[in-house]
Amino acid sequence: MTTWPPRIMRALEQFHATHPWDHNAHYHRWILRQLPRRLGRALDVGSGSGDLARLLASRAGAVHGIDVDPTIVDRARELTDPAAPVSFTVADALKEAPPGPYDAITCVATIHHMPFSDALTCFRHHLSPDGVLVVVGVYRPQPLSDYLIDAVAIPANVAMAWIKNKGRKAPRPASMTAPTRPATMTFADTVLDARRALPGARLRRRLFWRYTLVWHRS
């Protein structure tokens, strides 16, 4: 992912193994700012340990989280107050998502596990007429501009890990225990395919190897 010397990269990997922090949770508050203050129903695709789904419950009357990993879904249920308007399902979101419409659909660091265009089409189908889709995705660095962002992200990543963990070693949080795989699409390809499937979608490259996509159905 970078042109940094291997010795430095190994040292960084060792540091982050003992000072982990959730890059995806870093964007949760930003996601909330993209949504209306009140929602009827929300769907969180790739809900993991349920952190975002529980946050969405502060805005929505009902939140449904869906994930293919039964272990992490069990953990999400354990961490969620039974009185909260949140439910979780183990299923393939593209084939078995609870029928919409949804006023908001969120998908964080999950869409690269799916056929990208098919996923966007599916999400569009499940949105209400005035619904909003918010995606935080992962891309494969390719052009020089990606590596320049990478060069900024690496020291920022170390600083955030130190701040989040208050300088102490820590175990991996539950939200970081689900299986993952690297992204295969570049940001340029992501933008091209997204704007074909969702005309008017707003995409932006972000720090920590992420991009964001926001689309309002109207």
Task: Kindly give the residue locations of the regions a language model identified.
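Conserved Class I S-adenosyl-L-methionine
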Residues: 180-218
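Conserved beta-strand signature within the Rossmann-like core of class I S-adenosyl-L-methionine
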Residues: 130-137
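A conserved beta-strand element that flanks and buttresses the S-adenosyl-L-methionine
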Residues: 106
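Conserved class I S-adenosyl-L-methionine
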Residues: 40-46
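C-terminal alpha-helical "lid/dimerization" subdomain adjacent to the S-adenosyl-L-methionine
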Residues: 139-193
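Conserved alpha-helix/loop element of class I SAM-dependent methyltransferases that forms part
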Residues: 22-40
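Class I SAM-dependent methyltransferase SAM/SAH-binding core
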Residues: 49-51, 55-95
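A short, conserved alpha-helix within the catalytic core of class I
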Residues: 114-123
